[in-house]
């Protein structure tokens, strides 16, 4: 077992309610990406995601695409080659 796992699980337990609250805030934004009528809501969701990432210490920005905007966030100014990274593709 990873030696960091117990600390990670404890932190998740401690922040469960706050994490769920953030999730529900995002889910309340009507960001239906398949319906053009909700394009503004998709932008709102992207801005919300970027702002929330910044609140918890990430460098985050909203970037334009040919479709809906995408959110890019980094937890450090530079990434050393070979370090692990995460791609999260989720709601909005």
Q: Where do the protein language model's features map onto the residues?
A:
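Acidic/His- and Gly-rich active-site-bordering loop/insert found
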Residues: 2-92
């Amino acid at each position: 077992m990873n030696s960091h796992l117990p600390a990670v699980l404890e932190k998740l337990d401690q922040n469960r309610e706050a994490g769920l609250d953030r999730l529900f805030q995002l889910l309340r934004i009507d960001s239906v990406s398949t319906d053009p009528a909700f394009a503004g809501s998709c932008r709102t969701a992207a801005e919300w995601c970027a702002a929330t990432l910044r609140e918890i210490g990430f460098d985050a920005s909203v970037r334009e695409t040919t479709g809906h905007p995408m959110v890019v966030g980094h937890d450090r100014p530079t990434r050393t080659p070979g370090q692990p990274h995460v791609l999260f593709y989720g709601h909005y």
